[in-house]
Amino acid sequence: MRIVFDIGGSVLVPENPDIDFIKEIAYQLTKVSEDHEVAVVVGGGKLARKYIEVAEKFNSSETFKDFIGIQITRANAMLLIAALREKAYPVVVEDFWEAWKAVQLKKIPVMGGTHPGHTTDAVAALLAEFLKADLLVVITNVDGVYTADPKKDPTAKKIKKMKPEELLEIVGKGIEKAGSSSVIDPLAAKIIARSGIKTIVIGKEDAKDLFRVIKGDHNGTTIEP
């Protein structure tokens, strides 16, 4: 299979870089890449939001703040490249053609953000569509898609299986600003819906056994037509 992994910055760098998790996810990705083609997109997380909050004090535009976030995602991507060592494509990939070339070289391309207005969720969904991937795996700080934000609504229930259209109903009303964070952002949900790509949303614990996840054995949410 060809698989794109979308790793949230809040998972990789919650407050500071989670060295143990970075080592573990690098090991898991390396093992999966022995039998499958793998590409990765890394988010900015809290660090990106901290920088964006400071930029707001200077009345920076949303586009300018997006550029700040993109730089942080690429710094996070470099940490994962360091952990993947020789298995990774040696530089942060900045466009889909380069990612495709890296996959052909049997390397793992690691991307951050690309363009203002696109979250890394959207980048991952677009990359999966571009590469004609068989599977998109979203690793986030919430262990699946819920009927509402479980951090704000105690009655929220996890959805084990859903169609892309149902995902759009849940997340499609959001307005994305620089540094916005949701389990999957509206643009990514639209791309997932139009491409029909099978998507799995999991939390940090499930990410410790990616072979099990890609076989469908996980505690998260599966999204497919």
Curated annotation (Swiss-Prot):
Protein name per its UniProtKB record: Uridylate kinase
Binding site for ATP: 9-10, 45, 49, 140-141, 146, 149, 182
Purpose of the protein: Catalyzes the reversible phosphorylation of UMP to UDP, with ATP as the most efficient phosphate donor.
Subunit annotation: Homohexamer; trimer of dimers.
Stored Gene3D superfamilies: Acetylglutamate kinase-like
SUPFAM superfamilies: Carbamate kinase-like
Binding residue positions for Mg(2+) 1: 6, 120-121
Pfam family, one: AA_kinase
Pathway annotation: Pyrimidine metabolism; CTP biosynthesis via de novo pathway; UDP from UMP (UMPK route): step 1/1
Catalytically driven reaction(s): UMP + ATP = UDP + ADP
Activity modulation notes: Inhibited by UTP.
NCBIfam families (UniProt xref): pyrH_arch
A GO term, aspect molecular function: ATP binding
EC number: 2.7.4.22
Keyword set includes Transferase: yes
InterPro entries, per database record: AceGlu_kinase-like_sf, Asp/Glu/Uridylate_kinase, Uridylate_kinase, Uridylate_kinase_arch/spir
Taxonomic lineage from the root: Archaea, Methanobacteriati, Methanobacteriota, Thermococci, Thermococcales
Similarity comment: family membership: Belongs to the UMP kinase family.
Listed GO biological process terms: 'de novo' CTP biosynthetic process; UDP biosynthetic process
Subcellular location: Cytoplasm
